[in-house]
Regions:
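Active-site-proximal beta-strand/loop segments in catalytic clefts of secreted hydrolases
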Residues: 1-5, 27-30, 46-50, 78-82
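Short, proline-enriched alpha-helix->beta-strand connector loops that line the catalytic pocket
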Residues: 38-43, 72
Length: 114
């Protein structure tokens, strides 16, 4: 889980190590740069429509379709606001995580022959 640059790192590390993480939560990410992808943890992404720090058009509105095309289960929420995490979005993300609404495709250790 992360916000802003922390969300970018959460996406990058969570997708690279999807065999270790059951879920990824990214609040207002700027990019994702996974080295390689293992597993398919479900992903929660949110972004403010008035974000001037990491504009939604250049960030989440590009990231989410890439995740969809790659076969990830994504819950995406846009909200009317700036570069922040509204309480309602944080609560929704925590509910999503704690209720196991997303079921991760996690590889068991050793499945890849390593």
């Amino acid at each position: 889980m992360g916000f802003s640059d922390g969300a970018s790192y959460a996406l990058s590390l969570g997708l690279t190590n999807g065999d270790l993480f059951t879920h990824v939560i990214a609040f207002s990410p700027g990019f994702m740069a996974p080295a390689s992808r293992r597993g398919k943890p479900p992903v929660f992404v949110s972004h403010g429509t008035h974000d001037s720090v990491l504009p939604i058009e250049r960030c989440s509105r590009r990231i989410v379709p890439q995740l969809d095309r790659a076969g990830y289960q994504v819950r995406y929420r846009e909200f009317d606001g700036p570069h922040t995490v509204p309480e309602s979005i944080a609560r929704e993300a925590l509910h999503w995580f704690s209720s196991n609404e997303g079921t991760a495709d996690v590889d068991a250790p050793g499945d890849d022959g390593i």
